[in-house]
């Protein structure tokens, strides 16, 4: 039986992860290892300045106290889940992870850590906070497809699901990441002692929403599947940079 490590960034008790785990447990061996609280936008942060503790809930779920999503997958794969899991599934996130969101997302980061540790990995997000059952069934369907036809590309699958009933889903689309306009909102408040408090504002509005993007697919009622990879090298820029370096070295004056 496939052994799945399930994590997220919304916290171990979040509706998304609990709905997902309930659906997956009907077919697979599932172990939740997730933050004990909301750690949204934690990205790939790893805790190295203090020790971490675990809490095991009555149902067997494991919460990592003050841990990040990356901490949870690191500990789960390397120590807590035995035998070692076959795959990491992160989600269901409460809200989308489209376009530039993947840079900040703790949901995507948990999947990235799984892939970095050598496992297949899926991140699942719902474009809203209502139809978690839809996203759970979509995840089960994708896992079934992966078992029938294993994917050898070695990528992370970033899945975004429209927040609609399952019967209204039009199908799947393979997409690229779109983009948002840069977020510039900062909200300020003053505490009782007169100190200024700062709140980071919401993400920017959609920018690149071309027909092959994740934004376009979800807006049209399709499940978006975007392949992501751990290697951040900009390969197309390598030759350009080599030429630049050669010219810069020739023309340098000091």
From Swiss-Prot:
It comes from the Bacteria. SUPFAM superfamilies: SurE-like. It holds the Pfam family SurE. Disulfide bonds: none annotated. Its cofactor is a divalent metal cation. It catalyses: a ribonucleoside 5'-phosphate + H2O = a ribonucleoside + phosphate; a ribonucleoside 3'-phosphate + H2O = a ribonucleoside + phosphate; [phosphate](n) + H2O = [phosphate](n-1) + phosphate + H(+). Keywords: Cytoplasm, Hydrolase, Metal-binding, Nucleotide-binding. It is found in: Cytoplasm. Its main location: cytoplasm. GO terms for cellular component: cytoplasm. Belongs to the SurE nucleotidase family. HAMAP family: SurE. This is 5'/3'-nucleotidase SurE. It comes from Proteus mirabilis (strain HI4320). The gene is surE.
């Amino acid at each position: 039986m496939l052994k799945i490590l399930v994590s997220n960034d919304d916290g171990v008790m979040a509706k998304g992860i609990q709905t997902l785990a309930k659906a997956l447990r009907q077919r697979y061996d599932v172990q939740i290892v997730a933050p004990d609280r909301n750690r949204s936008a934690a990205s790939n942060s790893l805790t190295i300045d203090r020790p971490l503790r675990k809490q095991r809930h009555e149902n067997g779920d494991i919460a990592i106290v003050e841990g990040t999503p990356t901490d949870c997958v690191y500990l789960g794969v390397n120590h807590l889940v035995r035998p070692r899991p076959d795959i990491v599934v992160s989600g269901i996130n409460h809200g989308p992870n489209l376009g530039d969101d993947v840079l900040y997302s703790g949901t995507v980061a948990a999947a990235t850590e799984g892939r970095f540790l050598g496992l297949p990995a899926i991140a699942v997000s719902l474009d809203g906070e209502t139809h978690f059952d839809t996203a759970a069934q979509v995840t089960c369907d994708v896992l079934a497809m992966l078992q029938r036809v294993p994917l050898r590309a070695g990528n992370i699958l970033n899945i975004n699901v429209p927040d609609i009933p399952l019967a209204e889903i039009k199908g799947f689309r393979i997409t690229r990441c779109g983009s948002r306009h840069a977020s510039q909102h900062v909200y300020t408040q003053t505490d009782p002692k007169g100190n200024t408090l700062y709140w980071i504002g919401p993400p920017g509005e959609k920018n690149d929403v071309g027909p092959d993007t994740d934004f376009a697919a979800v807006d049209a009622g399709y499940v978006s599947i975007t392949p992501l990879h751990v290697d951040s090298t900009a390969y197309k820029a390598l030759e350009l940079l080599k030429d630049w370096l050669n010219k810069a070295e020739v023309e340098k004056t000091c």
